[in-house]
Amino acid sequence: MQWIEIIRLRTQPDVEPSVIKWLKDLIHGLGGTPGLDEARVYTHSAVPGDVSLHMMWDTMQEIFTESEVGLMVAEALKKYGILDHTVWLMKGKNGHRQVTG
């Protein structure tokens, strides 16, 4: 089953660059993690200090909860601000679309 794990941090704007660097370094090291298809780092378009990590998983399991990687990331980030850690199950999609430009 495909699912997504989202870790969202609301921190001070001056802390955001170091958090982004840490997350980017982290996701480059996640290659080969069983079940992890992709990991992406996002920032809010209008709110400085809002950062999120999206990890897309494809695993065979019956109970969906935070991953070990996600729990480690959340533990490391919680000292920087307000943290939200959620798991979402995919229930539908409209195919693969590539955007260029």
Walk through the language-model features, giving the residues of each.
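Short amphipathic alpha-helical segments
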Residues: 13-38, 68-77
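Glycine-rich beta-strand-turn "strand-cap" elements at beta-sheet edges
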Residues: 1, 37-49, 74-101
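Surface-exposed beta-strand edges and their flanking turn/coil or helix-capping segments
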Residues: 19-22, 34, 53-56, 66-68, ...
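Generic detector of short, locally flexible boundary/turn motifs and exposed helical patches
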Residues: 3-6, 15-21, 50-53, 95
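Intrinsically disordered, low-complexity regulatory segments enriched
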Residues: 8, 27-28, 62, 93
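Short coil/turn motifs at secondary-structure junctions
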Residues: 12-14, 58-60, 92-97
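Short, well-ordered beta-strand segments in beta-rich or mixed alpha/beta enzyme
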Residues: 4-9, 40-67
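Secondary-structure boundary/capping motif
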Residues: 8-10, 85-86
